[in-house]
Design a protein with these regions (language model features):
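Rhodanese-like catalytic fold shared by cysteine-dependent sulfurtransferases
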Residues: 1-37, 45-88, 99-147
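Conserved G/P- and acidic residue-centered "switch" motifs that form tight phosphate/ATP-binding loops
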Residues: 41, 96
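Short, surface-exposed ligand- or partner-binding patches at beta-edge/loop junctions that are enriched
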Residues: 92
Length: 147
């Protein structure tokens, strides 16, 4: 699948939008092999700083505490960072839902290659209601840091 994504990312003149789902390892591989790819962390600023984030991830929250309403400036903030609407944009949240919602908003704004990182940074809850034990960026042992 990653080969198809990489090939799609090279095609700069498409007339359709695509939201792909990649696991964290596939997303990391794409980031390493495509210098045009941009990783947007849609979690809150607190999550990004204190829970951790992949190196190079750009923090643009989809929702922010305390009201957890959609950030009305989200698309505008992405537009400031990602000028090429055909560049691959990878979206990361805690477990994969906020990033999918953010991808849909970017799709409506005309971005062409959107990638939701399934399981996000921390993954789903395990039987003890803990994250980070079943999947996610950190669980897969990928590079991350705190700020």
């Amino acid at each position: 699948m990653q080969g198809a994504i990489a090939e799609s990312a090279k095609n700069a003149h498409r007339d359709y939008t695509m939201i792909e789902n990649l696991d964290p390892q596939q997303a990391w591989d794409l980031l390493q092999n495509n210098s045009d790819a941009v990783l947007v962390d849609v979690r809150t600023k607190v999550e990004h700083s204190f829970v951790g984030h992949p190196p190079g991830a750009i923090s643009i929250p989809w929702k922010e505490a305390p009201d957890w309403q959609v950030n009305p400036q989200f698309v505008a903030e992405v537009k400031k960072i990602v000028l090429d609407r055909n560049a691959p944009i990878l979206l990361l949240c805690r477990s994969g839902q906020r990033s999918l919602d953010a991808a849909k908003a970017l799709e409506e704004a005309g971005y062409q290659l959107l990638i939701n990182i399934v399981d996000g940074f921390e993954g789903a809850l395990d039987e003890h209601k803990h994250r980070g034990n079943l999947g996610g960026w950190r669980f897969q042992g990928l590079p991350w840091e705190q700020s």
